């Protein structure tokens, strides 16, 4: 029986089409150019390389260039989220109907995650925030992130369901025995890599209730 739901935040609890992640992604590139002196025409290549080898741009910059991770996170998330997000009453209603405990499991900082959930009007549904600081910068899909989260939850892996728009983030959850859901939303930035680890595939976050 599923007792706990782990929700990814970005491009999962709101759609990729909102445009919020585009601005954050631009700010990641801007940080590399203006703060680290990376040539503008090489940023995309370096970020793809970090994505493949380390999972995220932050993880790559942290390991290879020893950046101040907190300064980076502050810079890239200094975005007015209300510009992109509005209260989502169907999401609010669906979350209210689901009896399971709910947490956010995100590679973003909790301070930003709270602002996002507040803008969506759904903050009250979430009991815990497993954010990049909780993960000690070992972001998804690093297996240690999942071990940390599971150790903090009052649930076994087989009682957890995890939802993420980045399919490869589901692999470690699946290996631990969680039920996994890939949100294959329009505008998915990462393609289908890892989709074989998804027990279910949904097109919008509103389909979660149907699975449960
Ligand atoms: Mg996401």
Residue ranges and their predicted role:
Residues 90-100:
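A short, Lys/Arg-enriched amphipathic alpha-helix followed by its capping loop at the start of a domain
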Residues 2-7, 12-92, 111:
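N-terminal helical cap/lid subdomain that shapes the substrate entry/recognition surface
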């Amino acid at each position: 029986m599923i007792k706990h739901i782990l929700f990814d935040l970005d491009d999962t609890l709101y759609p990729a089409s909102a445009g919020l992640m585009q601005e954050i992604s631009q700010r990641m590139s801007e940080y590399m150019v203006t703060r680290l002196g990376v040539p503008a025409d090489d940023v995309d290549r370096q970020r793809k390389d970090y994505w493949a080898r380390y999972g995220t741009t932050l993880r790559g910059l942290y390991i290879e260039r020893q950046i101040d991770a907190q300064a980076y996170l502050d810079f890239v998330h200094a975005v007015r989220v209300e510009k992109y997000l509005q209260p989502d009453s169907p999401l609010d209603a669906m979350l209210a109907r689901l009896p399971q405990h709910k947490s956010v499991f995100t590679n973003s900082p909790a301070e930003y995650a709270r602002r996002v959930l507040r803008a969506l009007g759904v903050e009250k549904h979430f009991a815990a925030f497993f954010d990049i600081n909780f993960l000690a910068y070992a972001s998804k899909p690093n297996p240690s992130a999942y071990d940390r989260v599971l150790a903090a939850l009052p649930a076994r892996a087989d009682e957890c369901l995890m939802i993420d728009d980045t399919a490869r983030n589901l692999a470690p959850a699946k290996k631990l025995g969680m039920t996994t859901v890939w949100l294959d939303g329009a505008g998915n930035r990462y393609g289908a890599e890892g989709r074989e680890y998804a027990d279910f595939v949904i097109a919008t976050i509103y389909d979660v209730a149907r699975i449960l």
